[in-house]
Amino acid sequence: MAKIELTNMVMVQNPETNEVLVQRRVKYWCGITFPGGHVEDGESFYDSAVREVKEETGLDVKNLKHCGCVHWHNTETNDKYIVLFYKTTEYSGELLKSTDEGEVFFTSIKNIKDMPLSPNFDKYLDVFLSDKYTEIFCNWNEKMKENCDGEPDWNFEYR
């Protein structure tokens, strides 16, 4: 039976500096990304996003706006991995320097593009930073490899 895995990712932006909060992940999905994680059983998508930001950054966020998603579909198993995207400029609390997930800090959007990013995070940024798209869809499976340019063999469809 096909599985569905639900996760979230949150762009927290400082309204005064326009810098965004990033995480330099060191365990899984290594590289620069926005904070986020799994939706737990019995938890709303929104509440899971608030909880994950708190756990990974120490910040309390509110008034999150849903801004899109990425839908990964495994063509061999029919499993689905869905990441719900949120963003906010409203937060409080003391920022942690790091957690077991990695270092967290504010930086400019321009600087992010020059940092070593988590896999496919550059594609996700297109949805977070533009009102042009609300979804990325991708068919993939474990047999697909990177091509000679180091790019994945699968296609990202923006909607």
Tell where the protein language model's regions lie, with residue ranges.
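Charged phosphate-binding loop/patch that engages nucleotide di/tri-phosphates or the phosphate backbone
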Residues: 129-159
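Unchanged
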Residues: 39-62, 72-124, 151-159
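N-terminal first-folded block
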Residues: 22-33, 41
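Short, charged/polar surface micro-motifs in flexible loops or helix N-caps
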Residues: 17-18, 28-29, 72, 88-94, ...
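A short local loop/turn or secondary-structure capping micro-motif enriched for an aromatic residue
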Residues: 29-32, 105, 144
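Conserved N-terminal beta-strand and adjoining loop/helix that marks the start
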Residues: 1-20, 35-38
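A generic fold-level signal
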Residues: 3-5, 15, 27, 78-80, ...
